[in-house]
């Protein structure tokens, strides 16, 4: 049986920008083991060389390193790129991918200056928004049993009926672990920066349309109004059950909590305000990640 998923499937051909770096080397190996079709990488200084990895079956393969995203796409037919370049070079790498019109771009890099991200997003919009960006500062996306574009551990769970979208990487992994026997269509870590490419709403809208996703789990956190906006969207556009969790109930006001975007100012951005908005939209909100997983399990088994 083929499972559906959103944004990423086993058919996607993936390249890695910065493939020769140490982080990229580790995660390229892991992605290949997870079944991802990695077809090459990009590093302008090492164009024309190859990097050697093992494929899923343990056979050694040589992946070509290209001078640009455009060249890599032209030679391999790649339609997904993952950015593993240091923060200083990230903006240029993102712009290069947008110029090449790659359909999906996953930006793992943490610590990209917000003005660089904002510039790149505006640039993408002006270019006609041909590239869906996930991230930055995120674990990426996994469609279990099919493909992994990012750093999410691929062996936690298999394919199943739950769609997960989360601002937090570690809470993504925990939720997948708690519901591992049920499985996931796709799990997306959208990142915790103040400016991100793919939002809760983008993912929820796609899960609503995906025939194999029966239940949606969204994990938010304090700061900003993304969860409140998602609640408004869910109220009018989503027929599937949604379960939510908001990280940061104990956060003091005015202090950034782990993520640059996780900051409470006044009553704006508090976990309580977000929980209230979500519950008003019919979302069942758990007090802890484990309680949230239990709610999801209960609802899924009653469908």
Curated annotation (Swiss-Prot):
Q: Which GO terms describe its cellular component?
A: cytosol; peptidoglycan-based cell wall; plasma membrane; succinate-CoA ligase complex (ADP-forming)
Keyword list, A-Z: Ligase, Nucleotide-binding, Tricarboxylic acid cycle
Name the positions where substrate binds: 173
For this protein, the record's InterPro entries field holds:
Cit_synth/succinyl-CoA_lig_AS, Citrt_syn/SCS-alpha_CS, CoA-bd, CoA_lig_alpha, NAD(P)-bd_dom_sf, SUCC_ACL_C, Succinyl-CoA_synth-like
EC number(s) reported in the record: 6.2.1.5
Q: Which SMART domains match?
A: CoA_binding
Q: Which reactions does this protein catalyse?
A: succinate + ATP + CoA = succinyl-CoA + ADP + phosphate; GTP + succinate + CoA = succinyl-CoA + GDP + phosphate
Function of the protein: Succinyl-CoA synthetase functions in the citric acid cycle (TCA), coupling the hydrolysis of succinyl-CoA to the synthesis of either ATP or GTP and thus represents the only step of substrate-level phosphorylation in the TCA. The alpha subunit of the enzyme binds the substrates coenzyme A and phosphate, while succinate binding and nucleotide specificity is provided by the beta subunit.
The name this protein goes by in its record = Succinate--CoA ligase [ADP-forming] subunit alpha
Q: Which organism is it from?
A: Mycobacterium tuberculosis (strain ATCC 25618 / H37Rv)
């Amino acid at each position: 049986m083929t499972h559906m998923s959103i944004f990423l499937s086993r058919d996607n051909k993936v390249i890695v920008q910065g493939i020769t770096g140490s982080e990229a080397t580790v995660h390229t190996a892991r992605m290949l083991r997870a079944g991802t079709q990695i077809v090459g990488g990009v590093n302008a200084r090492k164009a024309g060389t190859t990097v050697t990895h093992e494929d899923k079956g343990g056979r050694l393969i040589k992946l070509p390193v290209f001078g640009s995203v455009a060249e890599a796409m032209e030679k391999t037919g790649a339609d997904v790129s993952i950015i593993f370049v240091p923060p200083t070079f990230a903006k240029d790498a993102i712009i290069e991918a947008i110029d090449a019109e790659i359909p999906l771009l996953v930006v793992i890099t943490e610590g990209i200056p917000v003005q660089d991200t904002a510039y790149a997003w505006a640039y993408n919009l002006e270019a006609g928004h041909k590239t869906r960006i996930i991230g930055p500062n995120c674990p990426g996306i996994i469609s279990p049993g099919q493909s992994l574009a990012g750093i999410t551990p691929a062996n936690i769970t298999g394919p199943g009926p739950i769609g997960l979208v989360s601002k937090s990487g570690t809470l993504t992994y925990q939720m997948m672990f708690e519901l591992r026997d049920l499985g996931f269509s796709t799990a997306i870590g959208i990142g915790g920066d103040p400016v991100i490419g793919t939002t809760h709403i983008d993912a929820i809208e796609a899960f609503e349309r995906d025939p194999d996703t029966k239940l949606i789990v969204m994990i938010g956190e304090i700061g900003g109004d993304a969860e409140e906006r998602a609640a408004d969207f869910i109220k009018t556009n989503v027929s599937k059950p949604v379960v939510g969790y908001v990280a940061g109930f104990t956060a003091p006001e005015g202090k950034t909590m782990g993520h640059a975007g996780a900051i409470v100012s006044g009553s704006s951005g508090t976990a309580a305000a977000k929980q209230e908005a979500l519950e008003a939209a019919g979302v069942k909100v758990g007090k802890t990640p484990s309680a949230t997983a239990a709610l999801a399990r209960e609802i899924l088994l009653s469908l």
